[in-house]
Regions:
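Alpha-helical solenoid scaffolds in large eukaryotic transport, assembly, and signaling factors
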Residues: 2-4, 9-116, 121-129, 139-148, ...
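Intrinsically disordered, low-complexity, charge-dense segments enriched in Lys/Arg
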Residues: 108-213
Length: 213
């Protein structure tokens, strides 16, 4: 089993320079009141490491309503609080593993029993998103993390798997590690690559603006 303190330090180091989106870009969904209410406690918070676990746990639904950038920035606060066993409701493991394995559930309907597939191969909402599955959705959302951040997340998931009682979540965690996180940690874009891209974009825009002047 991985040493918990090493995993905690791994997370701190991997996310120490992660860019924070502006407040206007923290919220992903704008349907109804719940997304805005869920994300509101994070508005104006300039440093994820300063968030108290009690606030994180009370704001557990924010994990579902953050934008990709907001999720990336504030996730490490949830991971550390979870490793320190300070969360009662928030479940970062689910957010990092959902969409990589299938489950069958049976739903009684009168004299019939309806079998439904949930997870990886299930459609998100065909009327709105066509053939997009939860696997497609998960890979899109989680691709926001750099190679270094993905490595820290993989270490967290491995620790949670090994420390879990009675093997709870082990199957889902292994499916996610094999299907996404280990590859992302080995081959994903690095933090340096992202920084260089942003620098080049800024220089290009500055040059274009200068030429137009």
């Amino acid at each position: 089993m991985r040493d918990k303190q090493r995993v905690i330090e791994h997370i701190r180091q991997a996310f120490r320079d992660t860019e924070r989106p502006g407040d206007a870009f923290l919220q992903g969904s704008h349907e109804g009141r719940e997304p805005g209410e869920s994300v509101a406690p994070f508005m104006g918070v300039a440093d994820w490491s300063q968030l108290a676990p009690v606030i994180l746990d009370a704001s557990y639904t924010a994990l579902s309503f953050f934008s990709e950038g907001g999720f990336r920035y504030f996730l490490p606060a949830y991971l550390l609080a979870d490793l320190e066993e300070r969360l009662q409701t928030a479940d970062p493991v689910f957010q990092l593993t959902n969409g990589f394995s299938d489950k069958k559930v049976t739903l009684p309907a009168g004299s019939c029993v309806y079998e439904k597939t949930i997870g990886k191969s299930a459609f998100v909402n065909p009327q709105r998103y066509g053939a997009m599955t939860w696997h497609d959705h998960a890979r899109c959302q989680l691709s926001v993390f750099t190679r270094e951040e993905a490595g820290a997340i993989a270490a967290y998931l491995e620790y949670k798997r090994d420390a879990g009682r009675h093997g709870l979540n082990a199957e889902e965690i292994n499916a996610t590690l094999d299907g996404f996180w280990r590859d992302r940690a080995a081959n994903g874009p690095t933090q340096q690559a992202v920084r260089e891209h942003l620098k080049e974009e800024a220089e290009c825009l500055r040059d274009i603006g200068g030429n137009n002047g």
